[in-house]
């Protein structure tokens, strides 16, 4: 990401967002229920990002990647064993509210928010942490705070992506958010 942290846990955040939005949308099958589901998905993924980010961002490089991958697998196993998520069978019959115009709207909004963030003072602080963390800390940048904030923002966007995924494909299963989903996200970032 922008702070140079290598995370493989975004499949876990995406699954939190997908299940949250699916459960709310199935109970309230209206556009307002869908929007509430997206908001709840973003908030719950952000809380999970805070819970995971505080202890794991002391790690660096491969160790951070392994710890966040472990988080994603723990979340997947929890969803396999929960009754409310219908276990390994997952949830089906999710009302579809997402189509291409919705996807375009959320993608354009995400690009706009992130590009404005990068150009801001806080975005430049995150980029300086990625380039040289020791120099950033010497210049007075609160590196831990910015790393945790960037991790939370990333988890919120992953939760939103999961919510859109659930509404677009009608089905959410724990197998959809396994190790390979994290690798898919990594491949998309690299290429």
Annotate each PLM feature:
Residues 1-191:
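Transmembrane alpha-helices and adjacent helix-loop boundaries
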């Amino acid at each position: 990401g922008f702070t140079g942290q290598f995370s493989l846990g975004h499949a876990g955040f995406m699954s939190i967002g997908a299940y949250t939005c699916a459960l709310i949308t199935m109970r309230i099958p209206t556009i307002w229920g869908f929007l509430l589901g997206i908001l709840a998905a973003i908030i719950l993924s952000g809380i999970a990002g805070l819970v995971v980010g505080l202890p794991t961002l002391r790690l660096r490089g491969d160790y951070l990647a392994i710890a966040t991958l472990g988080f994603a697998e723990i979340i997947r196993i929890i969803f396999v064993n929960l009754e409310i998520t219908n276990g390994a069978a997952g949830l089906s019959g999710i009302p579809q509210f997402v189509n291409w115009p919705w996807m375009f709207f959320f993608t354009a909004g995400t690009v706009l928010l992130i590009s404005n963030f990068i150009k801001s003072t806080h975005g430049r602080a995150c980029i300086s942490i990625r380039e040289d963390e020791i120099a950033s800390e010497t210049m007075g940048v609160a590196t831990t705070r910015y790393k945790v904030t960037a991790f939370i923002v990333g988890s919120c966007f992953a939760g939103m992506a999961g919510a859109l995924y659930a509404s677009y494909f009608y089905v959410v299963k724990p197998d959809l958010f396994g190790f390979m989903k994290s690798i898919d996200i990594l491949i998309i970032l690299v290429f």
